[in-house]
From Swiss-Prot:
Binds 1 Mn(2+) ion per subunit. This is N-acetyllactosaminide alpha-1,3-galactosyltransferase. One of its GO terms (molecular function) is metal ion binding. It is found in: Golgi apparatus, Golgi stack membrane. It comes from Mus musculus (Mouse). The active site is at residue 343. The gene is Ggta1. The chain crosses the membrane at residues 42-60. The keyword Iron does not apply.
């Protein structure tokens, strides 16, 4: 009896082992199938990605203006590969069409249609974030004018004249602007003046109009310079945003000498400072004191921008003026004043809000520098700086 029980126990163990051994290959087979499925999906995904890359590369190479250099091909990549930074023309929906006055459909020109950096190999024409730097010879005026003629756009221009700046500069500024600024398009000149009785009589082009506003006089010219950010913002909110498509803000102590046209239009436009456009960022006169809201540390910064000219859409200029004035107020609380006042805050703003278009020094040139070979056509020139005559405190 004992022997029979022992035999039965041995048979149970043998059967258990047999079942275990037969189930083990089945488990391994299932795992292998899962691994093969995962590998198959990975291979399929790689094939899809490779196909997309090849098609995209063919698209880039199909653009006729793009050269063989890698940086040029990078520059022409569609805007969604540009970290959200575009020019005005790129920011609109591609292929958008506008109806012309004669009933034809006119396609909005893309950046590569009107801008050719290869025409000026002697200068920097594209920023690291792929925004155009507009130099004489890089833009197609006829193509741009053909498009903007259908848009019936209006461009605004703000200028401040207080104290002795009125007699010394305002009339020359307005008369030259009437001659060269946005020729053939509607323009509104917004003149901010501290004494309207001293406003010069200026006869304007039929497409141009003038709005004069009296502002409070400040004791210090530094305060006048900084308060203009607040004033511009207030006027944009009150009426300018409803009156113009683009807005430029300029200093009064300069004079137009050549066409300042639609090639300058953009969402956020900055002006290179004539004295610093060839310098390295380490030499820029940024605000270097950490306590100031305009502080830019060494090792940071792209260009040095001139506050004498900046522009863009009303919304973008409103944001710019608000942020700059916020920084000015913050500095006042800390009893500090940025080295170059509103210009220091402007440079800080452009550090974190990259301009979509930059104007070369030809658009704001100082003849005291001379006339180097890369300056082909001076659009706006500095007037003689007679600070001892026009400023209350120097």
């Amino acid at each position: 009896m004992i022997t029979m029980l022992q035999d039965l126990h041995v048979n149970k163990i043998s059967m258990s082992r047999s079942k275990s051994e037969t189930s083990l290959p089945s488990s391994r087979s299932g795992s292998q199938e899962k691994i093969m499925n995962v590998k198959g999906k990975v291979i399929l995904l790689m094939l899809i990605v490779s196909t997309v890359v090849v098609v995209f590369w063919e698209y880039v190479n199909r653009i006729p203006e793009v050269g063989e250099n890698r940086w040029q091909k990078d520059w022409w990549f569609p805007s969604w590969f540009k970290n959200g930074t575009h020019s005005y023309q790129e920011d609109n929906v591609e292929g958008r069409r506008e109806k012309g006055r004669n009933g034809d459909r006119i396609e909005e020109p893309q950046l590569w249609d009107w801008f050719n950096p290869k025409n000026r190999p002697d200068v920097l024409t594209v920023t690291p974030w792929k925004a155009p730097i507009v130099w004489e010879g890089t833009y197609d005026t006829a193509l741009l004018e053909k498009y903007y003629a259908t848009q019936k756009l209006t461009v605004g221009l703000t200028v401040f004249a207080v104290g002795k700046y009125i007699e010394h500069y305002l009339e020359d500024f307005l008369e030259s602007a009437d001659m060269y600024f946005m020729v053939g398009h509607r323009v509104i000149f917004y003149v901010m003046i501290d004494d309207t009785s001293r406003m010069p009589v200026v006869h304007l082009n039929p497409l141009h109009s003038l709005q004069v506003f009296e502002i409070r006089s400040e004791k210090r010219w530094q305060d006048i310079s900084m308060m203009r950010m607040k004033t511009i913002g207030e006027h944009i909110l009150a009426h300018i945003q409803h009156e113009v498509d683009f807005l430029f803000c300029m200093d009064v102590d300069q004079v137009f000498q050549d066409n300042f046209g639609v090639e300058t239009l953009g969402q956020l436009v900055a002006q290179l400072q004539a004295w610093w456009y060839k310098a390295s960022p380490e030499k820029f006169t940024y605000e270097r004191r950490e306590l100031s809201a305009a502080y830019i540390p060494f090792g940071e910064g792209d260009f040095y921008y001139h506050a004498a000219i900046f522009g863009g859409t009303p919304t973008h200029i409103l944001n710019l003026t608000r942020e700059c004035f916020k920084g000015i107020l913050q500095d006042k609380k800390h009893d500090i004043e940025a080295q170059w006042h509103d210009e220091s805050h402007l440079n800080k703003y452009f550090l974190f809000n990259k301009p979509t278009k930059i104007l070369s020094p030809e658009y704001c040139w100082d003849y005291q520098i001379g006339l180097p070979s890369d300056i082909k056509s001076v659009k706006v020139a500095w007037q003689t700086k007679e600070y001892n005559l026009v400023r209350n405190n120097v």
